[in-house]
Amino acid sequence: MKPTENSTGSAYPHPLDAILLAGTDTNARRLIKGQNKAFLELGGVALVRRVVEALIQADSIGQVFVVGPKLELEVVLSGLPSEVVVVEQAGQMLGNTWAAIHAAESRYFARHGVHDPDRPMLFTSCDLPLISARAVDDFVNRCAVEDDKVEHNYAILGGVAVEASLKSYYPRYGWDGILRPYVHFKNGLARLANIYVGRPRKLAHQDFLQTGFSYRKAKDWHNVVLLTWSFFKQAGGFRAAWLTIRYQATLMASRRGGWLYR
């Protein structure tokens, strides 16, 4: 049973609905041997089920809405509690997200008789093999603390992993490992952690989300050009395109010990 009162010490009075993205990518090159990564198995358990189990064990989470290929998801998620709701995918990432949001909003309205556009939700992806209920609760609590500091709650708060927390997964001593691209800040390197708390009804420029996701591998110059050009074609996109160009130029200049700066 999920608590109806806040037992986590956060500013959120009730558990959050979670939106879990497990859609099959329309770009075949992003599939893994032709397969949706949600269904890859680790220790005999599909990745998507691992994430769902962590979410339903978290005190900060109420219902879990999983969006993706419904028939396949219902098979790998069979036997889980009624708090888990499977939603048929609608297309690209943004369309899938809204399909799950609409399902969550409809269920909330059926139970409470009102809509609440300020209600926060948790958003995450299906490919987080190391996720745990404790980590989810910690993240939600941190977001609640940040929300509590401001007069108007944030539209979205994103999880960030700093380089120091990921170094133990680097290849070393002849073992295989994982190397991922980072965003370069003045005080260090960091990357988004594919987990967010947001209020989707308050989020502006949502087309930017799909554009950024489609061309997110910004270390590839082909994607950088496509990303910049796509921003130019969207309302309000000139500033986003200009910041993208500046960031890429700065990153290029910082390589090889920053010799271009000297």
Predicted regions: what they are:
Residues G34-V52:
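Short catalytic helix/loop segments, enriched in acidic residues and glycine
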Residues G68-L73:
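Short, polar loop motifs at secondary-structure junctions
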Residues S78-P120, L130-I131, D137-D138:
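Short phosphate-binding loop-to-helix
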Residues T124-C126:
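Active-site acidic Asp-centered loop
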Residues S132-R262:
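Conserved core of the sugar-phosphate nucleotidyltransferase
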